[in-house]
Amino acid sequence: MAEGAKRGVTRGYVLGLLGATLVVTAALVVASWGLLGMALGREPIETPDVPLWLGVLGIGIALGLLGVLLWRQALSLLRGSKSPVAGIVLGAAFGVYLVWNLVGLLAGLPNDETWFSPFAIILMPLWAVAVLLFWLVLARRIYTDRPTPQWPWERREGRE
């Protein structure tokens, strides 16, 4: 990476990237839970008295907290830190695990659907990857001279 900031980044760009990261993270949760559910032959919430929307609520709360952490990561990067903040990466990973388990315990889920659930454990690397991908894209935008990626038909070489 270059020594100083090469390009200014608007608040709109950061918010757009943050929103895209949250959407990708939610899609990764759906995909990983679907594959895990097919492989294990079970659902994330199997307790009959607990409604399934509590799982959606738990993931929604965790995504909201991820958004706050990503905003803090962006502020750190814009202030000149050129490496991901390890506390934010670890906070996101353990935070999603804690949120899922606390929502599950408040809803009355047993330990095998909260603390020891593979569905809860797989959330941790997904949240860590989301923070790192957000950092990579934003750092590339701020600290490099590289243009935005383009599809082959968008390339400028053939037009001139």
Q: Where on the chain are the PLM-derived regions?
A:
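Transmembrane alpha-helical insertion/packing segments
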Residues: M1-E43
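Cytoplasmic membrane-interface segments at the C-terminal ends of transmembrane helices
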Residues: A2-V14, L65-V89, G108-D112, V131-R159
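Hydrophobic alpha-helical segments and their boundary regions
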Residues: A5-T10, G16, T21, D49, ...
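Hydrophobic alpha-helical transmembrane segments
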Residues: L15-G19, L57, A86-L90, I121-P125
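Transmembrane alpha-helical segments of multi-pass membrane proteins
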Residues: L18-L22, P84-N101
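Hydrophobic cores of alpha-helical transmembrane segments in multi-pass integral membrane proteins
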Residues: V23-V30, G58-L65, L132
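Membrane interfacial helix motifs at helix-loop boundaries and amphipathic/re-entrant anchors
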Residues: L28-G60, W100-W127
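Core segments of alpha-helical transmembrane spans in multipass integral membrane proteins
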Residues: W53-R72, A93
